[in-house]
Structures are given as structure tokens and as C-alpha cells.
Regions:
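The feature captures the beta-strand-to-loop junction immediately N-terminal to the Walker
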Residues: 11-13
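Conserved ABC transporter NBD signature motif
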Residues: 34-41, 54, 88
Length: 226
């Protein structure tokens, strides 16, 4: 159970089920058992579109591209406001570390790098009125400067207290923002609590083979077994 308006980080070793859990909440993969409740409503059998209408948004690890669609058009579609102003579009792009003037009229095609597409997708999530924001490794493919802008955006969202934020991440700086941490291992919840309760136990629960937390980069500390 996740309380409203909380920032929750889901972490754990690779293959632990983090992305599968997030996709099941969004309806991208079917739940194999139990129920998924959103504000007391059973959404287990609802379609992706129906869940989106209820205010659930999802950011992919590898966002899709849309040839022929401009960035500003995508933001307008996401927001539900076809008349979204240029200034409003630029505001969302600036919040994810993009120079808005360089991107607002560009097409969502192969001319954009993976990191650029990732940041634009996060901007569309911010533009969409949502009660639950799900981000699957939002730091993937993002440079250090943009990563700082991303964490700043998460801090701002958290301070407003208007959304429940669910982030899958290995980045310690993102996890440190969370009100609660859920650690998954082998498809099971190994730990769930505040960061003060969970952080000291993370390495012990993973057996110390390799730390999946990444303080700044993508380096992984190798154990004696390595």
C-alpha cells in the first residue's frame, strides 16, 4: 500500500521484478494474481487507456519516437490542451534540462538522441494532469547536468504534494529523495519502509555480491566474489 502524495522509490538487483511491477500497475503487462487498487477502485482488469484516464502516467526506460509529430504537439496531447501555449511547452522542457527554444518545434524522430527523447517524455508526463506518476529509471541516458535538473524537478513535485510519485531507480541521489523505499528481490518485496529504515539494510539483503546503488555514475563496486 502506498499513501497518497508520497514519493516512493523501488530499487533492488537486476531481474528482481521492478519494471514488471511498474508495468503491471500501468496495465502494460497482466497481473498474474491479486488485485491492483487505485483510490479504492479495482483497476486490475482495466485497459491502459482507462488507467490513464484515472490519472496514472508512465515513463518508459526506452520511450517511443513519433515521426511527423512535433515536440510541442506531443506536449499538447499529453496535457489534454490542444491550445497549450509555446511558453507553457517551453516551461515543461526547461524543467527537464532542455533548451526549450531548440526543441519545441523539432520532430520526435531519429534525429533526437535517446537521452533527448527520454527527457521529452518526462516533460510530457509533467504536462499531463496525473495522480500517480510512474518513472522507470528516469536517469537512463541522461547527462550529469540534466540529471541535476531532473532531481530538482522531483524535489519540486514532492514539495507540492499533489502527486504520488513512483520511481524505479538505482541512483542514490534519487532514492534519497523518497519518503519510502521498496526493495524488490526475486519478485518479492524484501523491504518496505522509510529510507532511514531501509538504506542500512540494502547491501545486506542483496548478499553483498554487487551494490546496485549508483552514487553518481554507472559504476558498480565489485565484491571479492567478482
Amino acid at each position: 500500500t502506498i499513501d497518497n502524495n508520497k514519493f516512493v522509490a523501488i530499487t533492488g538487483p537486476n531481474g528482481g521484478g521492478k519494471t514488471t511491477l511498474a508495468k503491471a500497475i500501468m496495465g502494460l503487462v497482466p497481473a498474474t494474481g491479486g488485485q491492483i487498487l487505485w483510490n479504492g477502485q479495482d483497476i486490475t482488469k482495466l485497459s491502459i487507456t482507462e488507467r490513464a484516464k484515472l490519472g496514472i502516467s508512465y515513463g518508459f526506460q526506452q520511450p517511443p519516437r513519433f515521426k511527423g509529430l512535433r515536440v510541442r504537439d506531443l506536449l499538447a496531447l499529453a496535457s489534454g490542451n490542444r491550445n497549450l501555449s509555446r511558453d507553457e511547452c517551453c516551461s515543461y522542457l526547461n524543467r527537464v534540462g532542455l533548451c526549450a527554444a531548440d526543441y519545441v518545434d523539432r520532430e520526435m524522430d531519429t534525429s533526437l538522441s535517446g537521452g533527448e527523447v527520454k527527457r521529452i517524455e518526462i516533460a510530457t508526463i509533467l504536462a499531463r494532469p496525473s495522480g500517480l506518476l510512474i518513472f522507470d529509471e528516469p536517469e537512463a541516458g541522461i547527462d550529469l547536468w540534466s540529471f541535476a535538473k531532473l532531481t530538482e524537478t522531483f524535489r519540486l513535485l514532492q514539495s507540492k504534494g499533489k502527486n504520488t510519485i513512483l520511481v524505479i531507480s538505482h541512483q542514490e541521489r534519487i532514492i534519497d529523495l523518497a519518503d519510502e523505499i521498496v526493495m524488490l528481490s526475486n519478485g518479492q518485496i524484501a523491504r518496505h519502509g522509510t529510507k532511514e529504515e531501509i538504506m542500512p539494510n540494502i547491501l545486506a539483503d542483496t548478499g553483498g555480491v554487487c551494490s546496485f546503488l549508483q552514487p553518481g555514475g554507472n559504476n558498480c563496486r565489485q565484491s571479492k566474489e567478482g
